[in-house]
């Protein structure tokens, strides 16, 4: 297996033994993850795919060496330094109406090709896009448990955030996203807004989880932010 010096630095590969491990990771990535389930707050179980140290180190190198120049869309509030769930909720305080939507199977829906194209769109070289998309995906999706998955999800979703922000602006609404949770608020939310959002998501191979769609009519204040947080996310 031959990779250039730039990739050696990006991946933190410096020895033949490490290069051999990388070859095995690319050939059979599932063998480098430990899977277990955790209970969801809403019921059911979530599968966590935790990389073994040999893969986790390479993914950590990618995260530290590749993603620092990339910025998430301003409407993204999860996995962004200096932002948190309270900031996400604060955007929507004082909104008379609020619509909360959930993206179904968010991380698993982000395919290797989506990762490749997102990196390419942000100026990464073809070989970087190729190897990163291989190393950071599992079963053609982002593994929940890999340190690179959050940053990649924001990178992939950035063009959609732009579309959804434009849709919100058209109706005079505010929009923000916390991971797979989308929130729209304002004086009046059109009845077909959820359908319009769903149509945009479908263009990018994402789907709404309609069971989690929630609409609220209420005037919020800043002092209610913590209570409101439970509703938004």
Outline where the language-model segments fall:
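Short amphipathic beta-strand starts and helix->beta connectors
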Residues: 31-33, 84-85, 166-171
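Conserved polymerase palm-domain catalytic core
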Residues: 91-179, 183-228
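Non-catalytic, polymerase-adjacent accessory regions of viral genome-replication enzymes
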Residues: 1-37
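An N-terminal domain-start capping segment
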Residues: 1-12, 83, 120-131
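Short, conserved non-catalytic motifs in the polymerase core
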Residues: 36-59, 77-81, 100, 134-153
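Active-site-proximal segment of RNA-dependent polymerases
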Residues: 55-101, 105
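Conserved, surface-exposed functional patches that form binding/active-site neighborhoods
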Residues: 230-233
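N-terminal low-complexity, intrinsically disordered segments
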Residues: 10-19, 65-66, 70-73, 104, ...
């Amino acid at each position: 297996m031959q990779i250039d010096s730039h990739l050696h630095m990006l991946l933190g590969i410096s020895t033949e033994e490490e290069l051999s491990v990388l070859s095995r990771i690319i050939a059979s990535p599932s063998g480098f993850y430990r899977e277990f389930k955790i209970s969801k707050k809403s019921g059911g179980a979530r599968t966590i795919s935790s990389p073994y140290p040999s893969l986790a180190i390479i993914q950590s190198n990618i995260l530290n060496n590749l993603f620092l120049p990339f910025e998430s869309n301003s409407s993204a509030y999860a996995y962004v330094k200096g932002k948190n769930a309270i900031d996400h909720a604060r955007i929507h305080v004082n909104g008379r109406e609020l619509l909360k939507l959930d993206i179904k199977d968010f991380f698993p829906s982000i395919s290797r090709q989506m990762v490749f194209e997102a990196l390419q769109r942000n100026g990464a070289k073809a070989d970087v896009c190729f190897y990163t998309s291989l190393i950071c995906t599992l079963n053609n999706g982002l593994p929940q448990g890999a340190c690179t998955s959050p940053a990649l999800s924001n990178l992939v979703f950035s063009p959609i955030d732009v579309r959804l922000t434009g849709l919100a602006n058209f109706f005079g609404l505010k929009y923000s996203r916390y991971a797979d949770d989308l929130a729209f608020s304002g004086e009046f939310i059109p009845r077909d807004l959820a359908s319009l959002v769903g149509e945009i998501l479908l263009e990018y191979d994402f789907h709404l989880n309609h069971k989690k769609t929630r609409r609220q009519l209420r005037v919020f204040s800043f002092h209610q932010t913590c209570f409101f947080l439970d509703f938004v996310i």
